[in-house]
Amino acid sequence: VRDAYIAKPENCVYHCAGNEGCNNLCTCNGAT
């Protein structure tokens, strides 16, 4: 569920703000 949430680009930016590793994970999950 959490992965599906962060895979959405708008959610990823909010959830991963300032967290490069998390942003990279989101990108791998299909977010832009």
From Swiss-Prot:
Record's keyword terms, sorted: Disulfide bond, Ion channel impairing toxin, Neurotoxin, Secreted, Toxin, Voltage-gated sodium channel impairing toxin
Q: Which organism is it from?
A: Olivierus martensii
Q: In which tissues is it expressed?
A: Expressed by the venom gland.
Pfam families referenced in this protein's UniProt entry, alphabetically: Toxin_3
Entry GO terms, CC? extracellular region
Molecular function via GO: sodium channel inhibitor activity; toxin activity
Function of the protein: Alpha toxins bind voltage-independently at site-3 of sodium channels (Nav) and inhibit the inactivation of the activated channels, thereby blocking neuronal transmission. This toxin dose-dependently delays inactivation of voltage-gated sodium channels (Nav) (EC(50)=0.91 uM), and shifts the steady-state activation and inactivation to hyperpolarized direction. In addition, it dose-dependently alters calcium dynamics and increases phosphorylation of MAP kinases 1/3 (MAPK1/MAPK3) and cAMP-response element binding (CREB) proteins in neocortical neurons.
Q: Which residues form the LCN-type CS-alpha/beta domain?
A: 2-32
Where does this chain mainly localize?
A: secreted
Know anything about its domains from the record? Answer: Has the structural arrangement of an alpha-helix connected to antiparallel beta-sheets by disulfide bonds (CS-alpha/beta).
- Family membership noted in the UniProt record: Belongs to the long (4 C-C) scorpion toxin superfamily. Sodium channel inhibitor family. Alpha subfamily.
Name this protein carries in UniProt? Sodium channel neurotoxin BmK NT2
The organism sits in which domain of life?
Answer: Eukaryota
Q: Where in the cell is it found?
A: Secreted
Q: Which InterPro entries match?
A: LCN-type_CS_alpha_beta_dom, Scorpion_toxin-like_sf, Scorpion_toxinL/defensin
Signal peptide region: none
